[in-house]
């Protein structure tokens, strides 16, 4: 088995992952290892997460990163494509073919309304046996991110 934690420790680019995410990732993502999956990750940050997925899933993996920061384009390399755009731009998602990704990871703005809009727009892009993964959903409980403990507008309430 390709250990995700070991791959994380080898990263050359910046990446932040909570420790308790690793066993969850491996539980749900392991079936794609060695199967040349297509991954979409919203939110590029330092490019490390894209590198992590490319190395973890192995040869033939394609990773597409979307970020509104034009500086993220520098993380583009073989098998990693960077699209500079806002995750709430409907045209971006409607131009992509249906069922084009095995895994979609939203690690973008963490703002509840953006998470909800993104799920609604990208769901059609996920293959039937694919996975939609929204990171850092604890922000649903932050008023600053459009949520709150009992907020009907939080991503947690929506899902």
Regions found by a protein language model. Name each.
Residues 1-105, 109-134, 138-159:
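A short alpha-helical cap/connector motif
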């Amino acid at each position: 088995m390709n250990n995700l934690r070991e791959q994380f420790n080898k990263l050359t680019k910046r990446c932040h992952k909570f420790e308790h995410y690793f066993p969850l990732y491996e539980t749900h993502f392991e079936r794609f290892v060695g199967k040349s999956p297509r991954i979409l990750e919203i939110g590029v940050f330092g490019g490390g997460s894209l590198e992590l997925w490319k190395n973890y899933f192995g040869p033939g993996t394609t990773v597409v990163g979307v970020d509104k920061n034009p500086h993220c384009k520098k993380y583009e390399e073989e098998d990693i494509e960077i699209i500079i755009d806002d995750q709430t731009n409907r045209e971006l998602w409607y131009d992509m073919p249906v069922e084009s990704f095995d895994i979609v990871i939203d690690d973008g703005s963490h703002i509840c309304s953006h998470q909800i809009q993104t799920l609604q727009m990208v769901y059609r892009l996920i293959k039937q046996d694919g996975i939609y993964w929204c990171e850092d959903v604890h922000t649903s409980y932050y008023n600053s991110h459009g949520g709150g403990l009992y907020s009907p507008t939080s991503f947690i309430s929506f899902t």
